[in-house]
Amino acid sequence: MIDRLEKIQEKYLRISEELNSAKDPSSLKSLYKERSRLTPLYLKVEEYLKIYKDKKDAEELIPSEKDEEMHSMLKEEIRRASKKLEELEKELEILLLTPDPNSGKNILVEIRAGTGGEEAGLFVADLFRMYSKFADKQKIKSEIIDSAPTGIGGLKEIIFALEDERAYDLFKFEGGTHRVQRIPSTESGGRIHTSAVTVAVLPEADEEEIEINENDLRIDVYRSSGAGGQHVNTTDSAVRITHIPTGVVVACQDEKSQHKNKAKALRILSARILEKQTEDKKQASDAIKKQMIGSGDRSERVRTYNFPQGRCTDHRIGFTSHNLSAIMEGDLEELIGALTEEDRARKISETQVH
């Protein structure tokens, strides 16, 4: 283990040296980001290695130490050092976890109505409200990118951006199918209906990650339509972009300006292409899949919201809250904390420090 920790020291110091000589803005940005990520680990490694050295020095002195009091002091020093090293090993286990490559990124969140007709559309709007309230509490900037209203207060689909370095880590477990059980306001017999919506969390691509060639795009423009399909604009402001190499298609009609819709569509396109690339890599690596709490796939059932019982259950970790009303108001800290801890515990069990 000492060799591994010394290599971390060397890497950190090498990056610091490279920062002093780097002049290219993109290299500087990348180096600063990497050093910032490594700093907490480097400081903990420094502390561990110092205590480890002190313990070794004390162990070497004990055989030749004749003074009984000094012998006793050295043994006590070794005992304290051993205890502290055990504590530091646990902290290092967490810090040594392979960082998620998407950590620190802005994200796009896409919520779509699934089975359940109008009820599903209403729940899309409810989930968007829940996420918006949680983002507000966390002081995370949000922006609607595109939406498709149903006309009765619901949404067929909504895509919104969350811009903050904590956004991905806080929302990464939200991807999948969210099921809702409740009595619709139009239901006179009091029967509980079950409907579902799907959530996708798409990390936004950095410029260096995705390079889109204009020649690979087919761009179509058309008139935007509102609820019920009626045209809401007299000009061709809506934009549909097809990325020919991957077959990824996105459309945006939220803005009145074709230029703004194109910019938003390109933003979604970059995130979708990155998602496709990530999924391809995941399928090629069973090890990555095993490390995750759920796959984040749209088809995976992740959570049930039971309104008659006031209960919310996350099926991946068996977490149940009987305070559904608070959760729908954006109180997601306990739930997200439980998911984060479970994910961390699983990863630590596979990456022991020895």
From Swiss-Prot:
Localization: Cytoplasm
Keyword Coiled coil: no
Record GO terms (molecular function): translation release factor activity, codon specific
Region Disordered: start-end pairs: 282-301
Annotated S-S bridges: none
Pfam families, per database record: PCRF, RF-1
A cellular-component GO term for this protein: cytoplasm
Native species: Leptospira borgpetersenii serovar Hardjo-bovis (strain JB197)
Post-translational modification: Methylated by PrmC. Methylation increases the termination efficiency of RF1.
Modified residues annotated as N5-methylglutamine in this record: Q230
Family: Belongs to the prokaryotic/mitochondrial release factor family.
Keyword Electron transport (UniProt): no
Keywords assigned: Cytoplasm, Methylation, Protein biosynthesis
InterPro entries according to UniProt: PCRF, Pep_chain_release_fac_I, Pep_chain_release_fac_I_sf, Prokaryotic/Mito_RF, RF-1
Protein function: Peptide chain release factor 1 directs the termination of translation in response to the peptide chain termination codons UAG and UAA.
UniProt cross-references to SMART domains, sorted A to Z: PCRF
Protein name: Peptide chain release factor 1
